Amino acid sequence: MKFEPELESGKLIKRYKRFLADIKLEDNSERTIHCANTGAMTGCAEPDSTVFFSTSSNLKRKYPNSWELSVTENNHTICVNTLRANQLVVEAIQEQNIKELTEYDELKTEVKYGSENSRIDILLTGKSLPDCYIEVKSVTLLSESGQGFFPDAVTTRGQKHLRELSEMAQLGHKAVLFFAVLHSGIEKVSIAHHIDQQYHSLLIDAIENGVNILCYQAEMSSKEMKIVRKLPFSI
């Protein structure tokens, strides 16, 4: 995924009202940008940190700039735009970069499924293959020693998705929970049972029901983002 034009940078003043952030540019002018991430953003939104933002060509947008990346004091890069995770995984699958999913030849997004009326992030189909339901989750919470965690806050929506994936697996389909690691400092991923114990329990059930876990990391810069490597996962 290439950023065209290349992302611009500034210094974070503050994030507020969940969807907005104020930044200071190199000329000391201030600008309000849109924040697509409604989560806790733990460790991703420290005042005076460097942020990178894109500019929309849609002239009707009230806030044409979108917060894309943050750089931490340890020089780690984090993608804070939650919309990018799905786009990156779709691109990686289409470019045959996810070895576990290369046998499928058709990809759809946002397809209705399940008894709880959800929409699956990605649906893969192929001749003589079970349908493959993929739910994508962005991982940006870093603890000590390169340990990444998901989720960074209690997620009832995520719990629902695990129930839906379990249902698909039990019906004979392939079900995948795909962790897109969008923090350059993360070296391995685990479930944050200390944050959302119910999610942890549901994931154990999901794995027992046949849900597959994939965990891949992206490289990120002001010019592009790309899924590049598989990371270890533990429950």
UniProtKB/Swiss-Prot annotation:
GO molecular function annotations of the record: DNA binding
Gene3D superfamilies assigned to the protein according to its UniProt record, in alphabetical order: 2.40.50.580, 3.40.1350.60
UniProt xrefs under InterPro entries: SfsA (IPR005224), SfsA_C (IPR040452), SfsA_N (IPR041465)
Pfam families linked to this entry: SfsA, SfsA_N
Highest taxon, organism lineage: Bacteria
NCBIfam families, A to Z: sfsA (TIGR00230)
Family the entry assigns: Belongs to the SfsA family.
Protein name: Sugar fermentation stimulation protein homolog
Organism for this UniProt entry: Aliivibrio fischeri (strain MJ11)
